[in-house]
A protein has these predicted regions:
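Cleavable N-terminal targeting peptides that direct proteins into the secretory/outer-membrane pathway or into
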Residues: 1-57
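Periodic small-residue-enriched repeat registers in elongated scaffold domains
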Residues: 54-222
């Protein structure tokens, strides 16, 4: 191997080759030339072959947006962090793996969480909040409706101002409220204040363990 001023790199020279470029049989060194060209190419491009690929930046659109990795942020000051996160809307934030936030100032901060609606928030794993100011704070919690709140594990609040604040509780209807575990309140302004209690109907209230109140204005105390 010798340095070639013409090629600007090292070249391979056959032991059979002479200075005039011919071997003892009078044939030109075509093979030597091919090897030289190959060596030059490897020297010039070898570093590129082993250079680590840069991970593509996230997709972002709008003033002040931020998206890294495989995330997407669309809207003024929208932020998407994690992996597979989507933030869509002004000042919207999706900050955990596979989280989705859609709407003005909506925020999804739990893994696989979904927050849709103005000022909505889903802050725990698999939590879902849909509706303006809806809040789902518990694991697997679901809040559906304007200002609905589901704050405990496996809790569900469906309806405007519905509140479910205990594990496994369900509140369905406008202004319904459930405060103890495994309880159910269904109907406008229905309330369930005891554990494992059931309230069904308008303005129904159940109080105490396993209390059941059914029908308009019913009140059950166990």
């Amino acid at each position: 191997m010798v340095w070639s001023k013409a090629k600007g790199c090292y070249v391979v020279v056959s032991e059979l080759a002479k200075q005039n470029g011919k071997n003892k049989y009078g044939q030109t060194g075509d093979t030597t030339g091919l090897l030289s060209a190959l060596l030059c190419a490897l020297m010039l491009t070898g570093s590129a072959l082993f250079w680590p690929m840069e991970v593509s930046a996230g997709t972002q659109y709008g003033d002040g947006t931020w998206a890294d990795g495989y995330n997407t942020a669309i809207g003024i000051a929208a932020t998407a962090r994690g992996d597979g996160a989507l933030a869509l809307g002004t000042q919207t934030k999706a900050t955990s793996i596979r989280s989705t936030a859609i709407g003005h100032q909506a925020e999804a901060s739990g893994a696989d969480s979904i927050s849709i609606g103005t000022l909505s928030g889903a802050s725990n794993t698999h939590s879902i909040a849909i509706g303006d100011k809806a809040r789902a704070y518990g694991i697997d919690a679901i809040a559906f409706g304007a200002s609905a709140n589901a704050t405990a594990t496996n809790s569900m609040a469906v309806g405007r101002n519905a509140r479910s604040t205990a594990g496994g509780s369900v509140a369905v209807g406008i202004n319904t409220e459930v405060t103890q575990i495994n309880s159910v309140a269904m109907g406008a302004t229905a309330k369930a204040y005891g554990d494992s209690a059931v309230s069904l109907g308008v303005d129904v209230v159940s109080r105490g363990h396993s209390a059941v109140a059914v029908g308009a204005n019913a009140d059950a105390l166990a």
